[in-house]
Design a protein with these regions (language model features):
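Structural motif
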Residues: 20-22, 61-63, 103-106, 146-152, ...
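Short loop/turn segments that connect beta-strands within beta-propeller blades
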Residues: 25-29, 66-70, 109-113, 154-159, ...
C-alpha cells in the first residue's frame, strides 16, 4: 500500500482471474495497493471499523484485513465448497457468508469461531447477501427446477429464512444485495440482452420483506455487473466479461443511465467490490 492509504477511503475490487484484490483511493480512483495470495477471490464486505473481509471462493475461506492493511488478521474456514459473498451486520458485527453449492448461509457471530448454518428455502444455489440497517439479512439465489430467481429474508432474531415473492418486475439472474440507505437493492446480472452479446445489468430497489419493487436502475453500457457497491449517490460495478473488456464502472445512483467514469487497466475477471471508509 502507498503511504497514506490508511487515512483515505478505499475502493477494493477482487480480480478473480489474477487471484488478487486491488485497492483504490475513493472517490479519486487512484491505485494505492494490491493484496495477493488468494484462491479465487470473489465477494468483499466491510465492517463499521473499515476492516474488510474477502471471500476466497476456492480456498474455501474468508480472510480479514485492516483498512489499508497488507497482512491478514483473521481467517475463517468455510465448511462448504464454494463461498461467494459476504455481509457484516452493522449492529452486531456478525458476518454472513453465502455458499453457492450448498444453497445456504453461514453466520459467524461477531465474525469469529464456527458458523451457524441457515438453509435457503426453494434455492439450489445461493449467490449474494446483504444486511439492512435493522440487522435483517436478505439473500438471493436460483433454482434450476423452474429456472427461477429466489429471494429470502432472515429477520433479526429469527431462526430460519422466509421466501419473499417480489412483485413489480422479473429478475432474470441473481445479482448483489445491498442496503442503500432506504431500500434493499437487488441486482439483476441479466436484465436485458445487448447487441454485443452480453447482458446489460440493472439494480432494483425493493421494500425488502414487503416484497415490492419500487424503482429500477439500469446500468447502461455494462456487460455483467456481479457485485456492485453503492456509496451515496454513486454505484460502482465490476464488469466481468468472458471475451470482452473487463473494467470497473461508475454510475449515478439511483438514476443509472450512462457510465460516468471507469477504471480499465489491470483487470482480469473483476467480480467483487466494497467501499471501506477510513477510521475516524
Amino acid at each position: 500500500m502507498t503511504p497514506g492509504a490508511t487515512t483515505q477511503d478505499l475502493l477494493y475490487v477482487s480480480n478473480y482471474g489474477d487471484n488478487e484484490v486491488l485497492a483504490y483511493s475513493y472517490p479519486q480512483g487512484k491505485l494505492v495497493g494490491k493484496l495477493t495470495g488468494f484462491a479465487g477471490p470473489e465477494g468483499i464486505c466491510a465492517d463499521k471499523k473499515g476492516d474488510i473481509w474477502i471471500v476466497n471462493h476456492t480456498g474455501p475461506d474468508v480472510v480479514e484485513y485492516k483498512h489499508g492493511g497488507t497482512k491478514r488478521i483473521a481467517t475463517l474456514h468455510d465448511r462448504g465448497e464454494s463461498p461467494i459473498s459476504c455481509s457484516v451486520d452493522p449492529a452486531t458485527g456478525d458476518l454472513a457468508v453465502t455458499d453457492f453449492n450448498l444453497a445456504d448461509v453461514s453466520i459467524y457471530a461477531h465474525a469469529k469461531g464456527s458458523p451457524k448454518l441457515y438453509a435457503i428455502p426453494n434455492s439450489e444455489w445461493t449467490y449474494f447477501c446483504g444486511y439492512d440497517d435493522k440487522g435483517n439479512l436478505f439473500v438471493d439465489g436460483w433454482t434450476g427446477a423452474t429456472l427461477g430467481f429466489v429471494f429470502a429474508e432472515l429477520p433479526k432474531g429469527k431462526k430460519s429464512f422466509t421466501v419473499i415473492h417480489l412483485t413489480g418486475a422479473i429478475i432474470y439472474f441473481p445479482g448483489n444485495v445491498q442496503w442503500d440507505g432506504k431500500h434493499v437493492a437487488v441486482g439483476d446480472e441479466e436484465y436485458q440482452h445487448t447487441p454485443s452479446g452480453y447482458y446489460e445489468s440493472a439494480i432494483y430497489q425493493t421494500t425488502g420483506a414487503g416484497g415490492k419493487i419500487v424503482h429500477k436502475t439500469v446500468l447502461s453500457g455494462s456487460g455483467d455487473i456481479v457485485e456492485f457497491s453503492i456509496e451515496g449517490n454513486t454505484v460502482i460495478g465490476p464488469d466481468f466479461q468472458w471475451e470482452g473488456a473487463n473494467s470497473v464502472y461508475f454510475w449515478s445512483y439511483p438514476a443509472g443511465g450512462k457510465i460516468k467514469r471507469s477504471l480499465k487497466k489491470g483487470f482480469s475477471e473483476p467480480i467483487g467490490s466494497a467501499i471501506s471508509l477510513a477510521p475516524n
